[in-house]
Amino acid sequence: MPARALLPRRMGHRTLASTPALWASIPCPRSELRLDLVLPSGQSFRWREQSPAHWSGVLADQVWTLTQTEEQLHCTVYRGDKSQASRPTPDELEAVRKYFQLDVTLAQLYHHWGSVDSHFQEVAQKFQGVRLLRQDPIECLFSFICSSNNNIARITGMVERLCQAFGPRLIQLDDVTYHGFPSLQALAGPEVEAHLRKLGLGYRARYVSASARAILEEQGGLAWLQQLRESSYEEAHKALCILPGVGTKVADCICLMALDKPQAVPVDVHMWHIAQRDYSWHPTTSQAKGPSPQTNKELGNFFRSLWGPYAGWAQAVLFSADLRQSRHAQEPPAKRRKGSKGPEG
């Protein structure tokens, strides 16, 4: 009887405990980065907690799992060929450092914000380690076009379906298939809008395909978007607002999270309520009941004058705290008592 061919074993998500030889670490205390506060907080929509305190997602067209101990950020990268399984290289780790902008020292920023803002000082005691990701401009732009009138869970689903439909397949881990983010060319195709509507993007489908075409046909392609990193905040914000589906809030998100504009302060209903509730701020136009282009600029200027050139980072701390407290209030009491700090160390 002929021997049965052995099927290749499917690659699975790793944990630090199960495969320590395939991980590398970056010195980074929790006070400088809290993965559980940063990755699910509405900056990027592509990270999942696949195992307790182990976050898996796509960064620079590679699939990673990240976890942390008290003083270290631990990283493992998955390559398509199992024979190439090895710990991340120094160049690969540098991509992680840049993604989390670890050259920016949070402790100094928190100290400054706390010294000028007593409310921030109070909130920050429980929400150390909130920092801004430096995302790919294309991924950030189209993710936040999907964010219009939406919540984090629904945006996450839309972005995932967008990547599955138009992004390159990278690797399968357990029963999860990971895709890279689609290119401008892939999103500019003639059938894209109709396909995205079938995937549940609604009116945002038109904005996705129209913005991709506008960048390619009217603005000069990817280089135009990337060079906005060198422009002033005001110039970059104005340029982004030309694109279909990009208003003041979405433009501020892209400026802050992809274009190196730490002073950008995205204003949504959360920040509007925080400003009124905790800072007694009111727009000069007393009739204004919520965010608008004019009031967004006014509130952004208020926070910039209070917090300084990294105002967008300070805003992210308050936003994450408000988001976490809202989720906590909605959880059943039994779940609230559970936590996933991650591996000890």
Curated annotation (Swiss-Prot):
Residues 324-334 have a biased composition (Basic and acidic residues). Changing A85S: Found in a lung cancer sample. It comes from the Eukaryota. InterPro entries: DNA_glycosylase, HhH-GPD_domain, HhH_base_excis_C, Ogg1, OGG_N, Oxidative_DNA_repair_enzyme. DNA binds at N149, R154, R204, H270, Q287. Residues 324-345 are annotated as: Disordered. Residues 335-345 have a biased composition (Basic residues). Ubiquitous. Changing D268 to E/Q: No effect on activity. One of its GO terms (cellular component) is nuclear speck. GO terms for molecular function: 8-oxo-7,8-dihydroguanine DNA N-glycosylase activity; class I DNA-(apurinic or apyrimidinic site) endonuclease activity; damaged DNA binding; DNA binding; endonuclease activity; enzyme binding; microtubule binding; oxidized purine DNA binding. It is found in: Nucleus, Nucleoplasm; Nucleus speckle; Nucleus matrix. It holds the Pfam family OGG_N. SMART domains: ENDO3c. Its EC number is 3.2.2.-, 4.2.99.18. The keyword DNA damage applies. It catalyses: 2'-deoxyribonucleotide-(2'-deoxyribose 5'-phosphate)-2'-deoxyribonucleotide-DNA = a 3'-end 2'-deoxyribonucleotide-(2,3-dehydro-2,3-deoxyribose 5'-phosphate)-DNA + a 5'-end 5'-phospho-2'-deoxyribonucleoside-DNA + H(+). 8-oxoguanine binds at P266, D268, Q315, F319. Keywords: DNA damage, DNA repair, Glycosidase, Hydrolase, Lyase, Mitochondrion, Multifunctional enzyme, Nucleus. The active site is at K249 (schiff-base intermediate with dna). One of its GO terms (biological process) is nucleotide-excision repair. It is linked to Renal cell carcinoma: Renal cell carcinoma is a heterogeneous group of sporadic or hereditary carcinoma derived from cells of the proximal renal tubular epithelium. It is subclassified into clear cell renal carcinoma (non-papillary carcinoma), papillary renal cell carcinoma, chromophobe renal cell carcinoma, collecting duct carcinoma with medullary carcinoma of the kidney, and unclassified renal cell carcinoma. Clear cell renal cell carcinoma is the most common subtype. This is N-glycosylase/DNA lyase. The lineage of its organism: Eukaryota, Metazoa, Chordata, Craniata, Vertebrata.
